[in-house]
Structures are given as C-alpha cells and as structure tokens.
Amino acid sequence: MNLHEYQAKLLLESYGLPIQKGIIAYNGEEAAEAFDKTPTDVAVIKAQVHAGGRGKAGGVKLVKTREEAKEVAESLIGTNLVTYQTDAEGQPVNFVLVAEDMYPVKTELYLGAVVDRATRRVTFMASTEGGVEIEKVAEETPEKIFSITVDPLVGLLPFQAREVGFKLGLEGKQINQFVKLMTGAYKAFVENDFDMIEINPLAVRENGELACVDGKIGVDSNALFRQPKIAALHDPSQENERELKAAEFDLNYVALEGNIGCMVNGAGLAMATMDIIKLYGGKPANFLDVGGGATKDRVVEAFKIILEDSSVQGVLINIFGGIVRCDMIAEAIIAAVKEVNVTVPVVVRLEGNNAELGAKLLDESDVEIISAQGLSDAAQKIVDAVKAA
C-alpha cells in the first residue's frame, strides 16, 4: 500500500525528520487560504497522486499569489495526472498540497531504503545525485550510489549513519542532524512495516539545514492487520477498480496492458503463464492468482473481473491441481462460463490431481471451452484463438 506525499511527510515528521511544511486543499478556495498561511512568498502546489514524475507532467507548480494558487489548484483537482509511472488514464487528483518553497538550496541528495530480499534485511541507499529518478542514476552513474545493510538484531548504528553522511559530503553539525534523520527513518520503517521509503530530494538548504522536500512510502500490505492507523490512510481512488474488487474476494489481481486474460492458481505459475503467452506472440492482460483454495464463487468472480477489461479478447486458465481437485475446478469453470456469459475464446489447461477427469468434464460440457495439453499447447491455442477471433 502506498501513501500520499503529505501522509508520508507527516509520518516522518512524527519521527523527528525535518520536512517541507504544507497544507492540504480540496478546492481552489482552500488552496488560496493555504497560500496565505505559507511562511514563504512563493508556494508550491503539488498534485497528490500515487505516482512519480509529477513535475514533468505538470503536477508541481510554483505560485506567487493567492489568486494564482486558486487557479492552479482548480486546474489540477478533478483531473487525471498522467506521468511515466501511470497508465494512459493517469491517476485522479482529488486534492493538492500547498507547500512552502524551500529553494534555492545548496544541493539535493537522495536517501531511500527497501527490504533487500537477498539478505532479508533493510538496506539503505544514498546518493549525491538527488532530485532525479534513482533508476536513472543507477543506469548512468552507478558509482554515485552507495548502500548499507542494517542488522535487525542491533538496528541502525550511529557510525553507519555517520558514514553515509560523510559520503554525501555533509560536515559539522549536518552530520549530527543526518544521523538523527536517518535513525528516525529506520525506526519509522521498522515500526510501521514499510517495504520502501524514499526521500528525494533530501535538500541541504542555504542555511545548512537538512529538509525532506519530497517523501514516498510503501507499506507491506500483508502487515496492515497490525497497522490500523496506517491502513486508515488507504486511498482506494488511486488503485485500479478491478484490483480493488479482486481484493474483496482474496484474489491477487494486477492489471496489465495486453489482450489475453489469465486465471491461474499460484503466483509462480501465473508469472510463468504470462511469460509463455509473451513467448508465443501474445500479450497478457493481467496477473490473476485465484489461490490454492479456488472455488466456484471465486472462479466466477475472477471471470467477471477479467472480462470487465474491455481489451480482453481471450482467456487462458492454467490450473495445477494439488490440494484443489481439477474436476472440481472444471465444474466451477463450466458453471462460471455459463453464468458470466463469456463470449471470448477460453483455453483451459489442467494438470495434477484428477486432471484427466477434469479434462473429460470440459470436453463433455455444452460450453465452448478449448482444452489444452501442456503449457506450450495452451499458450499456442489461446494466441491462435485470439488472432482468429
């Protein structure tokens, strides 16, 4: 689960991090009032969406008067902001952040942290190249990025934070301030079950003070049950409607941009299915894992969610029967196809527990379902069926 910039900043501020102050506005009049309360002569209007690249997309603008603040806010609120991180539809802007202007600054730095799956520990990354996408820095000048891994048994140690501070070119009192900042960021990360935090840019102001000008936080969705305050910050408007509906039925769904819908049990098998569709010249429209305990109701809902995507021209169902029996899945598929009134080609590949019986049920049913033997056969058949449709 992602947080908005203003939510991330308020959370980080509660851990002692210096942030760029701002006020949320839901309309032009509120933006004008927020401008009047801004301590600087110039304010920054920031569209609040769960996506990066807002500045280049016109979602971050400087304003010098309350009238201009109102005008800019009204031009953003109620629209969809399209950035390099969104799809073609963009993300809805429901409110803006009216923030103090912290520029000019001496320099812009980068500080971020993620859960490193290789070491299973929190790893901090830092760079002197702040204010730009860290992916671009990693590609063009990887030597300017350095990292440290934190031992969870002892936590972030002061000498580690000082080491990072010195590598960032900080000196004197800035080092002590940075140690406090980085320690607070780590504490916030662990206590709130983050899976990602990014402060970009971390500015060194003209007076030498540090400030978090922007902040991104991703929270581990699997830990939300023990983070009720964080869960309450969830903004469903920033998520795909089909993904939200899938979550209601415990279906793992991620919308993609292809035309072949996928329904699979197991995340690994789902990824392999998408890969082989691509290999045979098709484009997957989604990732959908119905889980090991697939039932008729879940299969029906999965069909509905897949077919709500108007770009879907065919569906590939790939089921490995382990705990769940393939004959039961076959019955659920037949019932679901009838109930949902599926009009696009459907290819089904069953393997494992009672696979032969499941295939027989499909072949003897009165619905148009194409049976496949093996993963390659299934991928070839769905790609051919979509092309022929």
UniProtKB/Swiss-Prot annotation:
Q: Which UniProt keywords apply?
A: ATP-binding, Ligase, Magnesium, Metal-binding, Nucleotide-binding, Tricarboxylic acid cycle
InterPro entries reported in the protein's UniProt record: ATP-grasp, ATP-grasp_succ-CoA_synth-type, ATP_grasp_subdomain_1, Succ-CoA_synthase_bsu_CS, SUCC_ACL_C, Succ_CoA_ligase-like_bsu, Succinyl-CoA_synth-like
Ranges for domain ATP-grasp come to 9-245
* Protein residues bound to Mg(2+): N200, D214
EC number annotated for this UniProt entry? 6.2.1.5
GO molecular function ontology, one term from the record: succinate-CoA ligase (GDP-forming) activity
Q: Its pathway?
A: Carbohydrate metabolism; tricarboxylic acid cycle; succinate from succinyl-CoA (ligase route): step 1/1
- Offer a single GO CC term for the protein: cytosol
Tell me the cofactors it needs: Mg(2+)
Pfam families hit by this protein: ATP-grasp_2, Ligase_CoA
Cofactor stoichiometry and binding?
A: Binds 1 Mg(2+) ion per subunit.
Q: Where does substrate bind?
A: N265, G322, I323, V324
Give binding positions for ATP.
Answer: K46, G53, R54, G55, E100, Y103, E108
User: Which reaction(s) are listed as its catalytic activity?
Assistant: succinate + ATP + CoA = succinyl-CoA + ADP + phosphate; GTP + succinate + CoA = succinyl-CoA + GDP + phosphate
Any one biological process term the GO annotation gives: tricarboxylic acid cycle
Per UniProt, subunit arrangement is: Heterotetramer of two alpha and two beta subunits.
Record function comment: Succinyl-CoA synthetase functions in the citric acid cycle (TCA), coupling the hydrolysis of succinyl-CoA to the synthesis of either ATP or GTP and thus represents the only step of substrate-level phosphorylation in the TCA. The beta subunit provides nucleotide specificity of the enzyme and binds the substrate succinate, while the binding sites for coenzyme A and phosphate are found in the alpha subunit.
Family, similarity comment:
Belongs to the succinate/malate CoA ligase beta subunit family.
Query: What's the protein name?
Result: Succinate--CoA ligase [ADP-forming] subunit beta
Q: What is the lineage of its organism?
A: Bacteria, Pseudomonadati, Pseudomonadota, Gammaproteobacteria, Moraxellales
What gene name does this entry carry? sucC
